[in-house]
Amino acid sequence: MIPLDFLEKVEVFKELDDKQLTTVQTLCQEVGFARGERIFETGETPKYLWVVLEGEVALQWELPGRSALPETTISILRPQKTFGWSSLVPPYKYRLSAYCGTRTCKLIKVEREGLTGLFETDPATGYKVMTRLLAIVGARFLSLQDEIAKRRGSDIMNQW
């Protein structure tokens, strides 16, 4: 069972009290992956929200019919970080692929069905989690915008 001490530090669960965390804990399962192993693929219908327990996860943009490359890595996630938010937001399709980026990765998978069921029976928990999730997605979007601006600026400078 995933310790409550860890769950309370997870970015998406930080606002939850012990009772709410205990309920979330029942939906969690620890799984392991090896370096380079795919956790999920772009376009798949998500069944889980994921949390990094140990190791690193690389989120990569994949072109259809091509293998993942380091250059297509959008983000590296470390312990306590959440990914797979598409499991909670329509149209419920993963936007990126996820790979284990270290020798081994230990992850927590949180059942989407159980989590959405919890949100229906306990709207306060749902509100707290979705508010945190929105903040996380927003911050990642801003980070991506900054990276695109840097690259475009560099391209413009190189054309002079």
Residue ranges and their predicted role:
Residues 28, 46-47:
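Short loop/turn microsegments at loop-to-beta-strand junctions
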Residues 36, 47-64, 79-81:
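Glycine- and acidic-residue-biased ligand/ion/polar-headgroup-sensing regions
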Residues 1-30, 34-35:
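Cyclic nucleotide-binding regulatory module and flanking cytosolic helices
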Residues 5, 13, 49, 74-75, ...:
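A residue-level structural signature of the nucleotidyltransferase/glycosyltransferase Rossmann-like core
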Residues 125-160:
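Polybasic "coupling" helices that flank or enter modular domains
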Residues 72-130:
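Cyclic-nucleotide recognition modules
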Residues 39-44:
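Short phosphate-coordinating micro-motif centered on Lys-Gly-acidic
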Residues 63-71:
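Short helix-coil transition/hinge motifs at the ends and kinks of transmembrane helices
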